Curated annotation (Swiss-Prot):
Keywords, sorted A to Z: Endonuclease, Hydrolase, Metal-binding, Nuclease, tRNA processing, Zinc
Organism listed in the record: Saccharolobus islandicus (strain Y.G.57.14 / Yellowstone #1) (Sulfolobus islandicus)
Record-linked HAMAP family: RNase_Z_BN
One Pfam family cited in the UniProt record for this chain: Lactamase_B
Record protein name field: Ribonuclease Z
Residues annotated as catalytic: D65 (proton acceptor)
Molecular-function GO term, any one: zinc ion binding
CDD domains: RNaseZ_ZiPD-like_MBL-fold
Length: 291
């Protein structure tokens, strides 16, 4: 199970309805923050989302609406006496930006900060992919590892209830049971891991489409409803995001990075759903659960 909290779904500058980009991804105790617009620490604390429980932060690019909240989050972690290592992924300039800011603000973190290119553990991987913006930018693909499960329905049908048999089958061993040899490949099924992709700011481009194919959730730049010059600014219109979702055969599309010029987003959803019916436009502080 993966939960995604939409902490900030706006763009450029905050509006009354939408704060700046930030998304919290939770998976069985692992908390990942994607982008960190100004005010993210307040949103995390005010909604009891555990600022010090964040293990990994991924920044898509160095524009202020995506990164200006990072210093505050890290400073608050220090004030809360964090000891655990914080892992950060991001563009090449991010490390210099942070440590220069630490130097001028006389801040010395009480914990280790490690800059990484990707993340792997026994349950999940985080990879980056190239996006197409006006500055160096990258998206994030969070993938659960596939899991092997016992076909309980088949075992029940064959009246096999011995837990020792089940354990050996799951270990990939052939088991003799009531005069019959049970092969693991006949009783094991692969449960496909969930996948979540976040583009940050981007125009629709092939590198994004190829990287997000088949994901369970695509969070895609949808800055404008129908702005002819969207590509000039390195952003997508709603229809662009929907076409990417359609071509990449994703399961669900979340429109985000909504320009503050729009108070009513009813038309955004109508446009998206005409192209890709499984589209949503989350409000700030909404969340979804993938299973």
């Amino acid at each position: 199970m993966i939960q995604i909290f939409f902490l900030g779904t706006g763009a450029g500058s905050p509006s009354k309805k939408r704060k700046l980009p930030a998304f919290l991804v939770r998976r069985e105790g692992l908390n990942i923050l994607l982008d960190c617009g100004e005010g993210t620490q307040y949103t995390l604390m005010n909604n009891k989302l555990g600022i010090n429980s964040i293990k990994i932060i991924g920044i898509t690019h160095m524009h202020g609406d995506h990164v200006f909240g990072l210093l505050g989050v890290i400073a608050s972690m220090g004030l809360l006496d964090r000891k655990e290592t914080l892992y950060i992924l991001g563009p090449r300039d991010l490390k210099d930006f942070l440590y220069t800011s630490f130097e001028y603000s006389k801040f010395n973190p009480s914990f280790k900060i490690e800059f990484i290119d990707n993340y792997n553990d026994q349950n999940i991987t985080i990879a980056t992919f190239k996006t197409c913006h006006t500055v160096e930018s990258q998206g994030y693909l969070i993938s659960e590892r596939d899991r092997v499960k016992i076909d309980e329905e088949k075992l029940e049908k064959e009246k096999i209830k011995d837990w020792r048999v089940m354990r050996k089958l799951k270990e990939g061993k052939t088991v003799e049971y009531n005069g019959k040899f049970l092969k693991p490949e006949d009783y094991l099924v692969i449960k496909r891991g969930l996948k979540v992709a976040y583009t940050g700011d981007t125009i629709p481009c092939q590198s994004v489409i190829e990287s997000v194919k088949g994901v369970d959730l695509l969070i895609h730049d949808s800055t404008f409803l129908n702005e002819p010059s969207a590509f000039t600014y390195g952003h997508s219109n709603v229809a662009d995001a929907a076409k990417v979702a359609l071509e990449a055969s994703v399961k669900l599309l979340a429109l985000t990075h909504i320009s503050p010029r729009y108070e009513d987003v009813t038309e955004h959803l109508k446009v998206a759903r005409r192209i890709f019916p499984k589209s949503i436009l989350p409000d700030d502080l909404s969340y979804i659960t993938l299973k």
